[in-house]
Amino acid sequence: MAESVPITNLIELSGGSFLMGNEQDAYPADGEGPVREVFLSSFAISSTAVTNEEFKAFVADTNYVTTAEQSEDGSPPWSFVFAGLLPDDFPPTRGVLGAEWWRQVEGADWLHPEGPGSELEPECSRWNHPVVHISWFDAKAFAEWAGCRLPTEAEWEFAARGDLNQKRFPWG
């Protein structure tokens, strides 16, 4: 196995306390409440998402097979795809209750973002886009290969919020 590719776009964030979670009731079962104060030590996090090209290097180096490419029960592997990316004549499939914009698509994985027929070709302009259809297990394997670790939920929320204490969106 070749050496891992170091993540070069890490930024250091000073720790501190912040209010984590929210009590918005748009999705009551999302587990984001109650709001609680959390203290974090300083940590490093990538300033960008992992790209298709970076993930391709990981797969080429390790022969890794993602969760979306596997099937535990012999049925065809699948993943959820945003319904707005599917053709109008796409056959009805299982969705997610309360989030009907997600549709189950057989054959959707990181290399086929919208399912069969959407393969990332060698000359594709999406190699620098964020990789999709990646489970926590897939992300953890990539991070270990790259010599990093995944951020904790608190670190992720702290980084994503920036200085926007308890604001749901950047504009308020």
Segments the model singles out, each with a brief description of its role:
Residues S14, F39-S41, S46, A60, ...:
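A secondary-structure boundary/capping signal
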Residues A2-E12:
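GGW-centered surface loops in extracellular recognition modules
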Residues F43, F58-T67, A146-G147:
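Short capping motifs at secondary-structure boundaries
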Residues E12-L13, S17-L19, E23-D25, E72-G172:
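Functional-site microenvironments in short loops/helix caps that host divalent-cation chemistry
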Residues E37-V50, E54, E123-I134:
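Short active-site loop at a secondary-structure junction
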Residues M20-G31, A57:
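Cytochrome P450 core scaffold surrounding the K-helix E-X-X-R motif
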